[in-house]
């Protein structure tokens, strides 16, 4: 299991103007809340948080956040990126309390896609991440979806997945058995449509 750490500094200069000044200085604003403690506004070096989240696993791991020498365990709850440049503009972190269940977003990893593709199928991913609830010690790095037995017409729902021990899918708790992936036949263009296109 990887260890993830991040350094931050407390900030008191708040508001949109302050956030813009932070970004111009190569920092980003962030908020830490939860754990029955007051919310904290902090600032983090842009390059440091960018480097951390180059590793996909950081999104679903407990992170040791060091705020001016005070360490606390957190998970990322939300992240705002620039719409076109994709750099991180703001982050929300939730404190993790040992023995207390947390809710987190975990990436989905698809395996065995070659099997249905070799049979002429086209695989569509309808979910690339899933919301789970579990104790901090049980937080998975990812959820695996095995497509090796899938055929054309197969739809894999959340209820078809085997959750890791101690992990529950939030959507299922709300009776939302959503599709995660499906295999369908390739789209065939009618000959007359092809002819019309060629004529144009």
Curated annotation (Swiss-Prot):
InterPro entries the record matches: Rbsml_bL25/Gln-tRNA_synth_N, Ribosomal_bL25/Gln-tRNA_synth, Ribosomal_bL25_b-dom, Ribosomal_bL25_C, Ribosomal_bL25_long, Ribosomal_bL25_short, Ribosomal_L25_dom, Ribosomal_uL5_bac-type
Stored Pfam families: Ribosomal_L25p, Ribosomal_TL5_C
Gene3D superfamilies linked to this entry: Ribosomal protein L25, beta domain (2.170.120.20), Ribosomal Protein L25, Chain P (2.40.240.10)
Keyword Ribosomal protein part of the UniProt annotation: yes
One biological process term in Gene Ontology: translation
Single Gene Ontology MF annotation: structural constituent of ribosome
Top-level division of the source organism's lineage: Bacteria
GO cellular component entries: cytosolic large ribosomal subunit
Keyword Transferase: no
Keywords, sorted A to Z: Ribonucleoprotein, Ribosomal protein, RNA-binding, rRNA-binding
NCBIfam families: bL25_bact_ctc (TIGR00731), PRK05618.1-2 (NF004128), PRK05618.1-5 (NF004130), PRK05943.1 (NF004612)
Family per record: Belongs to the bacterial ribosomal protein bL25 family. CTC subfamily.
Subunit text: Part of the 50S ribosomal subunit; part of the 5S rRNA/L5/L18/L25 subcomplex. Contacts the 5S rRNA. Binds to the 5S rRNA independently of L5 and L18.
Function per UniProt: This is one of the proteins that binds to the 5S RNA in the ribosome where it forms part of the central protuberance.
Protein name per Swiss-Prot or TrEMBL: Large ribosomal subunit protein bL25
Native source organism of the sequence: Pseudomonas fluorescens (strain SBW25)
Organism classification: Bacteria, Pseudomonadati, Pseudomonadota, Gammaproteobacteria, Pseudomonadales
